[in-house]
Amino acid sequence: MYGKGKSNSSAVPSDSQAREKLALYVYEYLLHVGAQKSAQTFLSEIRWEKNITLGEPPGFLHSWWCVFWDLYCAAPERRETCEHSSEAKAFHDYSAAAAPSPVLGNIPPGDGMPVGPVPPGFFQPFMSPRYPGGPRPPLRIPNQALGGVPGSQPLLPSGMDPTRQQGHPNMGGPMQRMTPPRGMVPLGPQNYGGAMRPPLNALGGPGMPGMNMGPGGGRPWPNPTNANSIPYSSASPGNYVGPPGGGGPPGTPIMPSPADSTNSGDNMYTLMNAVPPGPNRPNFPMGPGSDGPMGGLGGMESHHMNGSLGSGDMDSISKNSPNNMSLSNQPGTPRDDGEMGGNFLNPFQSESYSPSMTMSV
């Protein structure tokens, strides 16, 4: 039926081969519909001199046209006015459902897009091997992406995921990662060493303060009842975005554990690493103490913020400016001294653990 060129059927046909096949199919169609004189006239006019092998009726051209016409009539814009088969309608419906959606169209609610510069190779090319034009898998953004915005997730999960535990030589136990809570922007400084300081405004975008909270080794996580979220806001780019602590491994969050309940500001924030302060106090990460992740700040009530910890401790967090951070519904009085400006807390200096303290939001 294919005549010349059948041996090259596996190769891409050339234009001349395509014209020859079309001429054969037209001749075959004319013969099958009973137009023998027209078929012979057609061959003589195109000066066909090769042997012809006919296929079974109704022939390829007729069969191909019927399939095309059925699919053409079953298109969504014509299916109401043209007759079509259920198979053709199902084909169009499947093709519409399997059409590739725009990028970010299938992002799960718990994953977010990065804010600020995206590292090279962040968006890896992906395509379904079986259906190249079919549905693409959802684009998964790692929770440790730079400035990732998490979705609706609990602040402190009651159980840790054993499959995500990682050990570190500088920590007493395996470093257990937690899913970041709502409203918090996790920082993933895996591109920077423990002693390196990433540039400001490189980990967060405008209005997106960064704060990486997670456990170190030691005691298990507390499970506060009313610890829903820690809301805070920033109207200036890059505020409260800082690199990992001086001694912590990359990606280790820094949440302090208060030493005691005195009014001295030296009890909770001691042994600060020497990092030059910046304007508007741009660098304020918090990290775990050696006694347990988020040991004491796992839930501070309002009176702990203003009363027992004193103005020298947590009151300096709340500033009288749009670049403030609120860890409680009752922030302390603002103050302007540079006691904590731009410095990083040593994640291994806090020594007390208060499991009875709960966070009030």
Curated annotation (Swiss-Prot):
<feature type="domain" description="LisH">
    <location>
        <begin position="18"/>
        <end position="50"/>
    </location>
</feature>
<dbReference type="Pfam" id="PF04503">
    <property type="entry name" value="SSDP"/>
</dbReference>
<keyword id="KW-0597">Phosphoprotein</keyword>
<feature type="modified residue" description="Phosphothreonine">
    <location>
        <position position="333"/>
    </location>
</feature>
<protein>
    <recommendedName>
        <fullName>Single-stranded DNA-binding protein 2</fullName>
    </recommendedName>
</protein>
<dbReference type="GO" id="GO:0006355">
    <property type="term" value="P:regulation of DNA-templated transcription"/>
</dbReference>
<keyword id="KW-0238">DNA-binding</keyword>
<feature type="modified residue" description="N6-acetyllysine">
    <location>
        <position position="6"/>
    </location>
</feature>
<dbReference type="GO" id="GO:0005634">
    <property type="term" value="C:nucleus"/>
</dbReference>
<feature type="compositionally biased region" description="Polar residues">
    <location>
        <begin position="225"/>
        <end position="236"/>
    </location>
</feature>
<feature type="modified residue" description="Phosphoserine">
    <location>
        <position position="321"/>
    </location>
</feature>
<feature type="compositionally biased region" description="Gly residues">
    <location>
        <begin position="289"/>
        <end position="299"/>
    </location>
</feature>
<dbReference type="InterPro" id="IPR006594">
    <property type="entry name" value="LisH"/>
</dbReference>
<dbReference type="GO" id="GO:0045944">
    <property type="term" value="P:positive regulation of transcription by RNA polymerase II"/>
</dbReference>
<feature type="compositionally biased region" description="Pro residues">
    <location>
        <begin position="246"/>
        <end position="256"/>
    </location>
</feature>
<dbReference type="InterPro" id="IPR008116">
    <property type="entry name" value="SSDP_DNA-bd"/>
</dbReference>
<feature type="compositionally biased region" description="Polar residues">
    <location>
        <begin position="346"/>
        <end position="361"/>
    </location>
</feature>
<dbReference type="GO" id="GO:0005737">
    <property type="term" value="C:cytoplasm"/>
</dbReference>
<dbReference type="GO" id="GO:0003697">
    <property type="term" value="F:single-stranded DNA binding"/>
</dbReference>
<keyword id="KW-0007">Acetylation</keyword>
<keyword id="KW-0539">Nucleus</keyword>
<feature type="compositionally biased region" description="Polar residues">
    <location>
        <begin position="317"/>
        <end position="332"/>
    </location>
</feature>
<feature type="region of interest" description="Disordered">
    <location>
        <begin position="147"/>
        <end position="171"/>
    </location>
</feature>
<feature type="region of interest" description="Disordered">
    <location>
        <begin position="194"/>
        <end position="361"/>
    </location>
</feature>
<feature type="compositionally biased region" description="Gly residues">
    <location>
        <begin position="204"/>
        <end position="219"/>
    </location>
</feature>
